[in-house]
């Protein structure tokens, strides 16, 4: 079975497995060319179903674009639902998009990574529900250091379920009990939770931010706002912009208080959950 559109289900393709096997030497040479470069000091494997080419350019793209600029070789997971990547694609220097669902190719990648002496890390989101804790333990046994990004309150609504997905809960429990795992938090409440469970060990605080250049440098100087937005600008008041999910955990009460002040204009950009 072989599907040829952008949702390339390569993991189901017998033809793809044969193609990788026949061209094994070529693929290994390509991977080795990447690993032989003197442009990095460490390697990060990003495992997540977030994807790269998604409507909201958010934390993962910001972080790993900058990691790549700071001598970190990144192999960033993309999904068959978001990115048309059969095997591997160079996104930027030191930044490669990888379809790990292509097990034939990813096996070759990890085979060559095993020979590499640079420090290696596996990094993933706390909210990721696709990667099981057993796989994380497998990475640890292979010598990878683990980075657990505790980015949000663990809420089943994020996954669209009534209960917290098993993979989310088990990875959280693993991160809270194994002090060899690095934990990155984005908020004080999450930091407090971690300290209560495992102390202030291998803990880093990294709040969400904005990649200013991403939003500014590509602006079209001739772009014209629609009439509704022009009317907001003409009011001459400070504009507060929000960019992110419009979900039940959003503080709508705070929004109402700001509106009552009648001093600001608020513009919301995001996907409604």
Describe the function of each predicted region.
Residues 45-47, 98-99, 111-130, 147:
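Short N-terminal targeting/anchoring amphipathic segment
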Residues 63, 153-154, 162-183:
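Membrane-proximal helix-turn-helix segments that form the acceptor-binding/catalytic region
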Residues 7-83, 261:
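N-terminal subdomain of nucleotide-sugar transferases
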Residues 189, 206-209, 218:
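Carbohydrate-associated surface elements
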Residues 1-6:
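Conserved small/polar residues in nucleotide/adenosyl-binding loops
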């Amino acid at each position: 079975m072989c599907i040829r559109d952008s949702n390339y289900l390569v993991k189901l393709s017998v033809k793809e497995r044969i193609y990788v096997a026949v061209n094994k030497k070529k693929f290994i040479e390509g991977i080795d060319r990447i690993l032989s470069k003197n442009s990095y000091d460490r390697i990060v494997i990003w495992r997540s179903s977030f994807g790269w080419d998604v409507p909201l350019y958010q934390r993962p793209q910001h972080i790993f674009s900058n990691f790549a600029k700071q001598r970190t070789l990144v192999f960033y997971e993309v999904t068959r639902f978001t990115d048309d990547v059969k095997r591997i694609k160079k996104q930027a220097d030191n930044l490669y998009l990888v379809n790990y669902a292509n097990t034939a190719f990813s096996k070759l990648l990890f085979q060559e990574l095993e020979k590499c002496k640079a420090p290696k890390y596996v990094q993933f989101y706390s909210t990721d529900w696709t990667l099981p804790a057993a796989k994380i333990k497998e990475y640890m046994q292979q010598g990878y250091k683990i980075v657990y990004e505790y980015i949000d309150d663990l809420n089943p609504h994020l996954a669209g379920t009534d209960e917290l997905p098993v993979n989310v809960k088990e990875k959280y429990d693993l991160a809270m009990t194994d002090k060899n795992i690095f934990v990155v938090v984005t908020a004080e409440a999450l930091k407090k939770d971690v300290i209560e469970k495992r102390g202030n060990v291998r803990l880093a605080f990294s709040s969400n931010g904005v990649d200013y250049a991403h939003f500014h440098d590509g602006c079209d100087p001739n772009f014209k706002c629609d009439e509704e937005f022009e009317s907001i600008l003409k009011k001459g008041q400070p504009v507060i912009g929000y960019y992110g999910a419009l979900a039940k955990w959003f503080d709508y009460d705070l929004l109402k208080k700001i509106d009552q002040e009648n001093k600001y204009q608020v513009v919301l950009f995001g996907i409604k959950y």
